[in-house]
From Swiss-Prot:
Its main location: membrane. It comes from the Bacteria. One of its GO terms (cellular component) is plasma membrane. This is UPF0397 protein Ldb1710. Keywords: Cell membrane, Membrane, Transmembrane, Transmembrane helix. The chain crosses the membrane at residues 13-33, 46-66, 79-99, 114-134, 150-170. InterPro entries: ECF_substrate-spec-like, UPF0397. Belongs to the UPF0397 family. It is a multi-pass membrane protein. It is found in: Cell membrane. It holds the Pfam family ECF-ribofla_trS. The lineage of its organism: Bacteria, Bacillati, Bacillota, Bacilli, Lactobacillales.
């Protein structure tokens, strides 16, 4: 377990700030409408998964939450707090799995990829259905059919985005790291 992932070190604070800015940029320019109101195919969640796996749950939550708040304010002039917290907790839950993987040491095996994808699909379902949908029903008096349709489509689209693009990004990242014990002194 990498205990540094829980700390707000200068490196993690920089990752939080830069990650939030990148979240806004990618969310603004790489968002594809789905046809369902306020529900888009968001490539930014592959980036969030990568950040959460590299820096852990604290930075994962911060980038998801802050990035989503800033993106909402920029795009709509207001924010939906339950969906912002949902994005933050998606980063947090994926970041929790990062504590069990040595991705910084070049390790991301097929088994770890499968577990990562199970974790992210479950996390997507939890955050978008519970925080997103139930939050909209309680806070905004939105009809259940509408918000559960949005949550279902969001879970599917974000899960697929992370499964494909997020897994590729993480495998490339792990491949760029020096494996533990691979360097030998002659």
């Amino acid at each position: 377990m990498n205990k540094d992932m829980w700390k707000l070190s200068p490196k993690n604070i920089a990752a939080l700030g830069i990650g939030s800015a990148v979240f806004v940029i990618v969310g603004r320019f790489a968002s594809i409408p789905s046809g369902l109101p306020n529900t888009n195919f968001e490539l930014v969640y592959a980036f969030l998964a990568m950040i959460a796996m590299i820096y852990g749950p604290t930075v994962g939550f911060g980038v998801g939450f802050i990035g989503h708040v800033l993106l909402d304010l920029m795009m709509y002039g207001q924010t939906w707090w339950n969906w912002n917290f949902a994005a933050g907790f998606l980063g947090f839950f994926i970041g929790l799995y990062a504590l069990r993987v040595n991705i910084d040491q070049g390790e991301f095996s097929a088994k770890e990829m499968v577990i990562f994808n199970v974790v992210q699909v479950v996390a997507n379902a939890i955050v978008w259905f519970l925080l997103g949908s139930v939050g909209d029903m309680v806070l905004n008096s939105e009809p259940a059919a509408k918000v559960f349709a949005q949550a279902g489509l969001t879970t599917l689209m974000d899960g697929l985005t992370i499964a494909v693009l997020g897994t590729i990004l993480l495998k490339l990242y792990a491949g760029s790291r020096v494996k533990k014990g691979s360097l030998h002194k002659d």
